[in-house]
């Protein structure tokens, strides 16, 4: 994997920094694991905007990724590692011994030809999946379930991982990248290693158009709007907001805690930094 800084042959190329991976599959994705992905433009079924800054962008197919890794005891060969437009991580196409193929989140260091396996007796090796109670303390893991059998929910994006720091009774304690220490049921599954494409954070799109290709529309500042559109709007000439930062609906933003799931508060040993 190489970091390529483009020559400034035009204004749109001047600030482009690419992450080039020659090992990624250059052909089409595996068709039986594709699904149609329609664009909403950020609108709900009434046609009203429920999420701002969404619209346009290149057409995409959704790749059906196996987040459960529940095909136990059957070895699989990594056929190839692919780009996935729906996530920052790469995905790997596995071919199991019984002929079935599945996509998984590609772990760091896993390449075509490697053998992976899931289950209680799986070797301690990057890319293998098993319950947390079978993983040694101190191991780095990703693709962690919060409920047994529900599928991976934590540490799924590029370069993400967590560390298993303790095991006590029916729970294990994980240290997340945010600094949060959290208890998770030991029966939940996780995959060893960290997620691939950790260089994703080093890239620079270089121009506004590259963001538009990804289906993201511009974000207008509140102070640049009229009073009818935003609490920060209006005033003669350039003005400060005149109040603490709020959302377009007047709710406090920038630093206000938004977590509301009190039912699982007792699972958090230490808050994130």
Curated annotation (Swiss-Prot):
GO biological process: cytoplasmic translation
Residues covered by region (Disordered): 34-54, 223-273
Keyword flag Metal-binding: no
Any GO MF annotation of the entry: transferase activity
NCBIfam families, per the entry: rplB_bact
Subunit-structure text: Part of the 50S ribosomal subunit. Forms a bridge to the 30S subunit in the 70S ribosome.
Protein name: Large ribosomal subunit protein uL2
Organism taxonomic ancestry: Bacteria, Pseudomonadati, Pseudomonadota, Gammaproteobacteria, Pseudomonadales
